[in-house]
Amino acid sequence: MRLAVRASTRWPGRPAGESTGVERGLQAIPSSFALRRRYREPVPFAEVDGVRLHYCDAGASEPAVVLLHAFPLHAGMWAPQLEHLSTGRRVIAPDFLGFGGSDAPDSMYRYTMLGYADLLAGLLDHLGLVRVVLCGLSMGGYVAFAFLRQYPERVSALVLAATRAAADTTAAFERRTDQQDQIAGIGTAALLEVLLAGLLSDHTRATRLDLVEQTRRLMANPAAGYIGALEAMKHRPDATGELAGITVPTLVMVGEDDTLSPPDVARSMLDGIPGAELAVLPRAGHLSNLEAPEEFNAAVTDFLSRQ
């Protein structure tokens, strides 16, 4: 199988031979999911509202699927899905502001859920896409809610994976503030290890050391992106009251062993969204698309085939 994935052979301003964050992520995925890439564009980024957004673009048929990555990873986490889903339709995987190959401004006003959603809308305009299927995992789900709130006419279907509709609790808000202070003081390295423990299931961390290391690499993003995303997440609005108004086909996905957004949270969203479907992935934690890629891909493919 030959995939047409638009990606850059060199990031402008970087030394020759040094790959972008997305390319490092793609290379770090297990070899059974390695992308066989044919480059279509010399530089895969879009200028939107004064910032440069990096993205991956594979496949052809529409409506396109837009994959929204988790915190604190970048779009490289979607390599198994880019390979599988793009055999049937176009797949876009952008880096959020502050992550991967996208710009990482220090100005915190740029980092809000609405800001991420507006930049995504600008990217879709750049790509000529009017309506898309949104698939958001964890923070990507928060952005999906923001996009659906602001641009409902541009969403044809929705996949919500390892995420929640509720806003942060007071404890979660304070924890994110402490994490921001820690990053500002000593950088991301120590926090990275703390976050990593919650992203993967105990089973994965005990038996798949390669995936643990690959996930660690996917988390190597600018400090400004970390701090900005934490700011956006702790101030995100509660979307629980909006669930009943979601009218597009929706698939809710969760790893059986996810401790950050556990199955009971997924079921509460399922109950709130009219006609929604649920997929629980066995022995997978928060990053179910990497821990159980075959099951994740199968569930999404089946869902899309019926839309």
Predicted regions and their residues:
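Short beta-strand/loop motif that positions the catalytic acidic residue
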Residues: 246, 252-254, 258
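Conserved alpha/beta-hydrolase catalytic His-Asp/Glu region
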Residues: 168-174, 185-245
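Flexible "cap/lid" loop of the alpha/beta hydrolase fold
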Residues: 142-193
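Catalytic histidine-centered segment of alpha/beta-hydrolase-like enzymes
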Residues: 284-297
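Alpha/beta-hydrolase fold catalytic core
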Residues: 1-6, 10-12, 18-66, 86-89, ...
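Active-site loop/oxyanion-hole signature of alpha/beta-hydrolase fold enzymes
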Residues: 48-56, 79-83, 92-135, 151, ...
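Active-site glycine-rich loops that stabilize anionic/oxyanionic intermediates
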Residues: 70-73, 138
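Catalytic histidine neighborhood in serine/cysteine hydrolases
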Residues: 263, 267-286
